[in-house]
Amino acid sequence: MQQKLKKGIFECDGHEIYSDREMHIGGINTVKVDTDLHCKMNKITLTIENTNIFRAVWRKVLDRMVWMDYEWTVKADLDSVFVPNRLLHYVQDPWIQNHAQEGNGLWLNNCWRGLHGPIEVLSRQAMQIYNNRWLQCEAVAEAKPQEDVYLQECMQTLGIWKSDMKHLLAEDHCDHHDFWKCEGNFVAYHPFKEEKKWMECRNNLGDD
């Protein structure tokens, strides 16, 4: 649906879909990641322990080197209503522009509680540092079974700049309890697992 309507990641200058198998979907071939996509739920924290899965995905992304052609790389969950033009607007901020491609680059934090996984945004320089110094995050991966916590702490370990962006994500887990109304100027809204609900949300956001 998103591909047919040219919405979500298909509004970006480039896009790829990652899966555990090669498939042809709407004219697009998925990129196969050689990993088991099954993971367990931590019964105490009630969080999904998926770091190993997303480490494999990020490694595949880095190895393909497509990210080098773009100023920003975005990992967006399928059930996120993602509006790329809004992100493009926010990253024009002079501070973000200055830090994105200098030094160790920049990543965008989407919640005051810490990074949440529905949308993750890294500058090209941050991707370069992540690629070059990948092994420095192995200890973090072993200690942090949740992929968003892993990525945040990996970025910190690598000395990559952070920018807190309050309008990056609207979701219940970050105290946006009315996210489902799809109001305001957020870049992404999450979650919308039903196709009809996803489309209603996207339509409510207008032509951004």
What are these regions (language model features)?
Residues 141-208:
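C-terminal catalytic/acceptor-binding lobe
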Residues 20-24, 35-39, 78-81, 87-89, ...:
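Conserved beta-strand elements of beta-rich interaction domains across eukaryotes
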Residues 50, 54-59, 83-85, 115-135:
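Conserved nucleotide-sugar donor-binding
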Residues 72, 107-122, 136-145:
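A recurrent flexible, glycine/aromatic-enriched loop bordering the glycosyltransferase active site
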Residues 1-13:
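Short, acidic, metal-binding catalytic loop of nucleotide-sugar glycosyltransferases
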Residues 65, 80-114:
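Conserved donor-nucleotide/metal-binding helix-loop-beta segment in metal-dependent transferases, i.e.
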Residues 16-71, 81-85:
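Active-site-proximal specificity loops/subdomain of glycosyltransferases
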